[in-house]
Amino acid sequence: MQPFPAVVVGGPPNSGKSVLTYHLSQWLRQQGVDHYVVRACPDGEGDWYQEAPAQQVRVLRDKGDFSSAFVAAVCRDLAHRHLPLIVDAGGRPRPEQEIIFDQCTHALLIAASDEGLAEWRQLAERHGLTILAEVRSTLSEPDLVDASAPILRGQIHGLVRQQRVAGPML
């Protein structure tokens, strides 16, 4: 049994997964929590994508292919982890890519709608992941916590690249 968790951050496209992953990782670093972020989607994003000027990002970003070799490499790395992992997953995994989730232990779900959360909840349950949080993402509505146990549920706002995120959901 793997002693370290691998928490997939999952949700539909453009729901704020990468921005939330970045801010969660920054918060964990400030708390002195050793961890590593695995970008399990070849979309060319990473911490640099959050920190670099937008014009530079447009020039440098290089989307890769979601090939079987990429999926195999991600699965291998997840299986041999030596630290807790945050796994930034793509928003539209195809069935052959879902094997990545079999290497994970937990899920943090984020979506702009209840339907998006339900879709990803089914995916997480199908792969035996323990759901830690279900977060509704909005650009302008205030943050709120609906429930803190057994699953953190609530709303987070302002998950926009290059903007600071703070609030009770983070």
Model region roles, listed by residue range:
Residues M1-F4:
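Phosphate-binding P-loop
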Residues V7-Q30:
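Glycine-rich phosphate-binding P-loop
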Residues V8, P84-D88, L108-I110:
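Structural motif
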Residues Q30-W48:
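Short beta-strand-centered segment that lines the nucleotide-binding/catalytic pocket of NTP-utilizing
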Residues V33-H35, L85, I131-L132:
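Hydrophobic anchor at the start of a short beta-strand
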Residues Y49-D65:
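Conserved NTP-binding/hydrolysis module of P-loop NTPases
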Residues R58-D62, D77-P95:
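Switch II (G3) loop of P-loop NTPases
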Residues G91-P168:
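Conserved catalytic-core segment of NTP-binding enzymes
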